[in-house]
């Protein structure tokens, strides 16, 4: 290779300062492009392994030539210049070979990169296609899920059952031979039948609407006719007023009252209806009326009107409210007044008794508490002289107390009210009963209200059956209460004058001559009764409640004085009075130290039925007092006389007794046998 390269002549290079012509430049470019492309083609034909071996060989030759040149130069002889030149030429040839190999390597590298880039582009294209396919798969899966979860409108339609469908649907819709085995066709057929039924119902609906419009037109015509009749009827009613007054048939007044009753709250309305029905059916003397402002009652049901004030007025109001801010006490008072507010209308019942006395009952309804209250007043045909001891008999606070046992009307019957009271600081309703009335349980029942204690409810509906079941019994109890109180009122007037009134029907219960007499009859307070030493057993037994009335009677005969403490239950005369005795004669004697005093108490407390007299037993109290006078006579007359004392006996025996004493306790004969007129033991 070195000999061939040395024989070749170097090409001449012509350098010139001027710029080559255009034709020469184009020809050189064409040659370069051809050479470049020939090298690229040669790269495809050459083996990279052989080029690598050629590269290693060329490098070794260059190393060898460089070493020889260095050795020749180190000798320093003149003959070696030609050899050095030859070796230099050979080295240049090897350098040309390395350059060519370098170019080929770069071309291979470029082709490899291009191929790698093309392969990468293909991989990216395939990856993008894969991503697109995965997205399409995911989208299709979502659509499939939506399709599976899709609920058709027909599933919300309540179709008829299969039995009803095949029994009622016509054959052209049911198609039993097709739909029996195909659920899809069966559902379509059922939907067709549903559509057919709805079309029929729609047709019927249109017919009903047309009929409704016709009926409405007829109603309007009749309303116009009736409205034209109203003025005529009013004139007829106005003209018939004198006839109604003459025949005692106040139809116009009753009509107005019924119109007013429409504005009553439900409990008062139930009371009004049931009391009116009871008066018409059972008691003609019972009169029912409505009092109060109808306009205020109507205003309760009207929605508040929106008032739009000017800005100046609103600013003035804001300034006033900021300047005058109510205190906490004023706010609580306003809340209490609002909670205890009564309905504007009330129901008045006038219950007439046999002696022409009238019990006036005014029923109120507390709207926020949902309870009813009552105020009572008794009027008599003749003005009564009120004795001192009868002051509480006809008082509105006690005349209706305990009409039913335990119903004193001092606390609310609605358990839910206590929670309402706690919010506004009301401890009990007792402080407001004089102003509002008493919320007795029987009043709630007359209004149809029932409050269960187990489950307190804020709202309780009025029930007509509840009112009707208690109306008759309550009216009878009210009449009995008024008659018994009036009878006691008259009896107390005599008792305060020391006279025990005994009617002719009860004269047979006592002997003809009674020496002991009543000298004092007075009312006493509950606290004073509790302090008496001979009434402790009554107090401990719980018979001395604060709703009872307490009296003290003093019976005298000579030096003997008998004190009788009387407990009068509000339910008198159904519940008898209870007596406790204390005899001051030869010492103080009570039921704790004298068996005969205990026997005297038993005669009036236990054997009271003998003293009731004719019904309704209003003479029981006076008969008991008269019996006490007789018992004191027997006690004193049967007492043994001390022989050491000279002179006549203080209490000579005037009563006929079969036997003066009996038993070791020396009991006296206190039982009076009225046909024979003698006394005996029980």
UniProtKB/Swiss-Prot annotation:
Region (Interaction with CSF1R): 2-144
Phosphothreonine sites (modified residues): 327
InterPro entries: THO_Thoc5
PTM per Swiss-Prot/TrEMBL: Phosphorylated on tyrosine upon binding to activated CSF1R; which causes a dissociation of the two proteins. Phosphorylation on Ser-5 and/or Ser-6 is required for nuclear export. Phosphorylated on Thr-327 in insulin-stimulated adipocytes.
GO cellular-component term (any): transcription export complex
Region (Disordered): 1-42, 300-334
Motif segment (Nuclear localization signal): 7-10
Compartment(s) where it occurs, according to its Swiss-Prot or TrEMBL record: Nucleus; Cytoplasm
Region spans: Interaction with THOC7: 2-199
Modified residues (Phosphoserine): 5-6, 307, 312, 314
Region (Tandem RWD domains): 247-682
GO molecular-function terms, A-Z: mRNA binding
Compositional bias per record (Acidic residues), positions renumbered to this chain: 306-319
Coiled coil: 81-247
GO biological process: blastocyst development; cell morphogenesis; monocyte differentiation; mRNA export from nucleus; mRNA processing; negative regulation of macrophage differentiation; primitive hemopoiesis; regulation of gene expression
Glycyl lysine isopeptide (Lys-Gly) (interchain with G-Cter in SUMO2) cross-link, renumbered residues: 153
Phosphotyrosine: residues carrying this PTM: 225
Residues of the signal peptide: none
Keyword annotations from UniProtKB, A to Z: Acetylation, Coiled coil, Cytoplasm, Differentiation, Isopeptide bond, mRNA processing, mRNA splicing, mRNA transport, Nucleus, Phosphoprotein, RNA-binding, Transport, Ubl conjugation
Biased composition (Basic and acidic residues): 22-42
Family, similarity comment: Belongs to the THOC5 family.
Function: Component of the THO subcomplex of the TREX complex which is thought to couple mRNA transcription, processing and nuclear export, and which specifically associates with spliced mRNA and not with unspliced pre-mRNA. Plays a key structural role in the oligomerization of the THO-DDX39B complex. Regulates the expression of myeloid transcription factors CEBPA, CEBPB and GAB2 by enhancing the levels of phosphatidylinositol 3,4,5-trisphosphate. May be involved in the differentiation of granulocytes and adipocytes. Essential for hematopoietic primitive cell survival and plays an integral role in monocytic development.
Assembly information from the UniProt record: Component of the THO subcomplex, which is composed of THOC1, THOC2, THOC3, THOC5, THOC6 and THOC7. The THO subcomplex interacts with DDX39B to form the THO-DDX39B complex which multimerizes into a 28-subunit tetrameric assembly. Component of the transcription/export (TREX) complex at least composed of ALYREF/THOC4, DDX39B, SARNP/CIP29, CHTOP and the THO subcomplex; in the complex interacts with THOC1, THOC2, THOC5, THOC6 and THOC7; forms a coiled-coil dimer with THOC7; together with THOC6 and THOC7, plays a key structural role in the oligomerization of the THO-DDX39B complex.
Name of this chain's protein: THO complex subunit 5 homolog
Natural source organism: Rattus norvegicus
Encoding gene per record: Thoc5
């Amino acid at each position: 290779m070195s000999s061939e390269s040395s024989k070749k002549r170097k090409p001449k290079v012509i350098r010139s300062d001027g710029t080559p012509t255009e034709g020469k430049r184009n020809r050189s470019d064409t040659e370069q492009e051809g050479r470049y492309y020939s090298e690229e083609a040669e790269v495809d034909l050459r083996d990279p392994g052989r080029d690598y071996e050629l590269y290693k060989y060329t490098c070794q030759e260059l190393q060898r030539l460089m070493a020889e040149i260095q050795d020749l130069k180190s000798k320093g002889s003149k003959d070696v210049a030609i050899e050095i030149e030859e070796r230099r030429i050979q080295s240049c040839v090897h350098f040309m070979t390395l350059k060519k190999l370098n170019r080929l390597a770069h071309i291979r590298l470029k082709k490899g990169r291009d191929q790698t880039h093309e392969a990468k582009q293909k991989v990216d294209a395939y990856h993008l296609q894969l991503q697109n396919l995965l997205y399409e798969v995911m989208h299709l899966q979502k659509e499939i899920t939506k399709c599976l979860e899709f609920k058709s409108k027909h599933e919300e339609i309540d179709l008829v059952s299969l039995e009803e469908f095949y029994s009622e649907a016509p054959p052209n819709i049911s198609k039993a031979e097709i739909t029996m085995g195909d659920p899809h066709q069966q559902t379509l057929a059922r939907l067709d039948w549903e559509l057919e039924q709805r079309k029929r119902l729609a047709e019927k609906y249109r017919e009903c609407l047309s009929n409704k419009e016709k009926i409405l037109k007829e109603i309007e015509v009749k309303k116009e006719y009736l409205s034209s009749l109203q003025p005529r009827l009013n004139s007829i009613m106005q003209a018939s007023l004198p006839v109604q007054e003459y025949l005692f048939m106040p139809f116009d007044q009753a009509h107005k009252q019924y119109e007013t009753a429409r504005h009553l709250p439900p409990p008062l309305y139930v009371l009004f209806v049931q009391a009116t029905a009871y008066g018409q059916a059972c008691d003609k003397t019972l009169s029912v009326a409505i009092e109060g402002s109808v306009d205020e009652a109507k205003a309760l049901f009207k929605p508040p009107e929106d008032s739009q004030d000017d800005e100046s007025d609103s600013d003035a109001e804001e300034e006033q409210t900021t300047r005058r801010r109510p205190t906490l006490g004023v706010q609580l008072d306003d809340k209490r007044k609002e909670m205890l507010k009564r309905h504007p209308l009330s129901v008045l019942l006038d219950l007439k008794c046999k002696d022409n006395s009238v019990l006036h009952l005014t029923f109120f309804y507390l709207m926020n508490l949902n309870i009813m209250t009552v105020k009572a007043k008794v009027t008599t045909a003749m003005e009564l002289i009120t004795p001192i001891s009868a002051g509480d008999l006809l008082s509105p606070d006690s005349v209706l107390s305990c009409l039913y046992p335990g119903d004193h009307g001092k606390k609310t019957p609605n358990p839910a009210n206590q929670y309402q009271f706690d919010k506004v600081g009301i401890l009990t309703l007792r402080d407001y009963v004089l102003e509002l009335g008493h919320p007795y349980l029987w009043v709630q029942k007359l209004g149809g209200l029932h409050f269960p204690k187990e489950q307190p409810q804020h709202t309780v509906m009025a029930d007509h059956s509840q009112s009707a079941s208690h109306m008759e019994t309550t009216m009878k109890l009210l009449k009995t209460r008024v008659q018994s109180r009036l009878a006691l009122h008259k009896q107390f007037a005599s008792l305060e004058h020391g006279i025990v009134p005994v009617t002719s029907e009860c004269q047979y219960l006592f002997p003809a001559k009674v020496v002991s007499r009543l000298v004092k009859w007075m009312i006493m307070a509950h606290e004073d009764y509790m302090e008496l030493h001979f009434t402790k057993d009554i107090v401990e037994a719980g018979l001395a409640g604060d709703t009872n009335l307490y009296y003290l009677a003093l019976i005298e005969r000579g030096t003997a004085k008998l004190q009788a403490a009387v407990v009068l239950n509000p339910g008198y005369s159904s519940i008898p009075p209870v007596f406790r005795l204390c005899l001051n004669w030869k010492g103080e004697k009570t039921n704790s130290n004298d068996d005969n005093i205990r026997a005297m108490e038993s005669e009036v407390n236990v054997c009271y039925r003998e003293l009731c007299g004719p019904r309704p037993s209003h003479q029981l109290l006076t008969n008991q007092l008269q019996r006490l006078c007789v018992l004191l006579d027997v006690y004193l007359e049967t007492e043994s006389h001390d022989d050491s004392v000279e002179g006549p006996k203080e209490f000579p025996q005037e009563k006929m007794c079969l036997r003066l004493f009996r038993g070791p306790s020396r009991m006296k004969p206190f039982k009076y046998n009225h046909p024979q007129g003698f006394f005996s033991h029980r």
